[in-house]
Amino acid sequence: MKGFGWLEGLLRVGRKLFVKAETVQYPEVRPYLPPRSRGRIVLTRDPDGQERCVACNLCAVACPVGCIDLAKAVAEDGRWYPEHFRINFARCIFCGYCEEACPTAAIQLTPDFELSEWRRDALVYDKHDLLIAGEGKVRGYRYWSVAGKAIQGKDKGEADHEAPPVDLKGLLP
């Protein structure tokens, strides 16, 4: 049936003519996001209001594209905290490896995906941009009370819900 290609095209267009359009009016109509969708990264706080991040650098090591940069500092009481914490969202692929690697549940991915900017340098978020006021998804978790690390004023085993260290030599026969 040579020469009837125009008729096939006309029929295809005619079938789609009366079908409802699939265009979504985005800003007014929000798309459905699955419950575990991964979007913008945030840093959370303890129930006491302190930063959860202990600058262990596991998130930066786990990141496959190397978009996380941080430097560790030590507070007066012996706690570690990030002196600076930067995420370059222009490079981030939102894989969630940083969230899985974080031992303190400080890094969490939210369903917020609207990160468009006019300039690329605006997509580099600092610690003050990433910190939120709440605890995020993990409630009531205090890393420093279960870490087993001595801080000023408390030796190992003196924190809440913490057993004293085991004397290994005392276990020998």
UniProtKB/Swiss-Prot annotation:
The gene coding this protein: nuoI1
Q: Which family does it belong to?
A: Belongs to the complex I 23 kDa subunit family.
Subunit comment for this entry?
NDH-1 is composed of 14 different subunits. Subunits NuoA, H, J, K, L, M, N constitute the membrane sector of the complex.
Q: Which GO terms describe its cellular component?
A: plasma membrane
Q: What is this protein called?
A: NADH-quinone oxidoreductase subunit I 1
One record GO biological process:
aerobic respiration
What topology does it adopt in the membrane? Answer: Peripheral membrane protein
Q: Mention one GO molecular function.
A: iron ion binding
Q: How is the cofactor bound?
A: Binds 2 [4Fe-4S] clusters per subunit.
Q: Which UniProt keywords apply?
A: 4Fe-4S, Cell inner membrane, Cell membrane, Iron, Iron-sulfur, Membrane, Metal-binding, NAD, Quinone, Repeat, Translocase, Ubiquinone
Taxon lineage = Bacteria, Pseudomonadati, Pseudomonadota, Alphaproteobacteria, Hyphomicrobiales
Q: Which residues bind [4Fe-4S] cluster 1?
A: C53, C56, C59, C102
Q: Which InterPro entries match?
A: 4Fe4S_Fe-S-bd, 4Fe4S_Fe_S_CS, NADH_quinone_OxRdtase_chainI
Question: Its domain of life?
Answer: Bacteria
PROSITE patterns for the chain: 4FE4S_FER_1, 4FE4S_FER_2
Q: Where does the UniProt entry say this protein principally localizes?
A: membrane
Origin organism is Rhodopseudomonas palustris (strain BisA53)
For this protein, the Enzyme Commission number is 7.1.1.-
- Reactions catalysed: a quinone + NADH + 5 H(+)(in) = a quinol + NAD(+) + 4 H(+)(out)
Q: Which residues form the 4Fe-4S ferredoxin-type domain?
A: 41-73, 83-112
Quote the function comment for this protein. Answer: NDH-1 shuttles electrons from NADH, via FMN and iron-sulfur (Fe-S) centers, to quinones in the respiratory chain. The immediate electron acceptor for the enzyme in this species is believed to be ubiquinone. Couples the redox reaction to proton translocation (for every two electrons transferred, four hydrogen ions are translocated across the cytoplasmic membrane), and thus conserves the redox energy in a proton gradient.
